[in-house]
C-alpha cells in the first residue's frame, strides 16, 4: 500500500512539473534589467508601453493584465521573454 501511494506521488510530481516558476523581467522603462520570480500558477509575462507627458513609458511584470485603450500590451510565455 505504501509503495502504491509513493508511486502515485512520484507520478503526480513528474506529470504536473511541480516546482516550476516563471521568471519575468520587471524593470521599468529604460532601467537596468531586473527579474522577478512569479507567483505559482502564473504562466506568462507582460510588457506595457505608452506615452505620457514624461515621454515613452514601459512597465514589465508577471501575468497578462487588461489595459486601457492607447496602451500597447505584449504577453509571452517563456522565461524573461518580456525584455
Swiss-Prot record:
What is a single molecular function from GO for this protein? acetylcholine receptor inhibitor activity
What coarse category fits the chief subcellular location reported for this protein? secreted
Q: Which UniProt keywords apply?
A: Acetylcholine receptor inhibiting toxin, Disulfide bond, Ion channel impairing toxin, Neurotoxin, Postsynaptic neurotoxin, Secreted, Signal, Toxin
Expressing tissues = Expressed by the venom gland.
What subcellular compartments does it reside in? Secreted
The record's InterPro entries line, in alphabetical order, gives: Snake_3FTx (IPR003571), Snake_toxin-like_sf (IPR045860), Snake_toxin_con_site (IPR018354), Toxin_cobra-type (IPR054131)
Single GO cellular component annotation? extracellular region
Source organism, top-level taxon: Eukaryota
CDD domains documented for this protein? TFP_snake_toxin
Residue pairs linked by disulfide bridges in the UniProt entry: 24-45, 38-62, 64-75, 76-81
What are the boundaries of the signal sequence?
1-21
What family is this protein classified in? Belongs to the three-finger toxin family. Short-chain subfamily. Type I alpha-neurotoxin sub-subfamily.
Main function = Bird-specific neurotoxin (tested on chicken) that acts as a pseudo-irreversible antagonist at the nicotinic acetylcholine receptor (nAChR) of the skeletal neuromuscular junction. Has no significant effect on the electrically-induced twitches of the rat isolated phrenic nerve-diaphragm preparation.
Protein name as annotated: Alpha-elapitoxin-Ppr1
Q: Which organism is it from?
A: Pseudechis porphyriacus (Red-bellied black snake)
Amino acid at each position: 500500500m505504501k509503495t502504491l501511494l509513493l508511486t502515485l506521488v512520484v507520478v503526480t510530481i513528474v506529470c504536473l512539473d511541480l516546482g516550476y516558476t516563471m521568471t519575468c523581467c520587471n524593470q521599468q522603462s529604460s532601467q537596468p534589467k531586473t527579474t522577478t520570480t512569479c507567483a505559482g500558477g502564473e504562466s506568462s509575462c507582460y510588457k506595457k508601453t505608452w506615452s505620457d507627458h514624461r515621454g515613452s513609458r514601459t512597465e514589465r511584470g508577471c501575468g497578462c493584465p487588461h489595459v486601457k485603450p492607447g496602451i500597447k500590451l505584449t504577453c509571452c510565455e517563456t522565461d524573461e521573454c518580456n525584455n
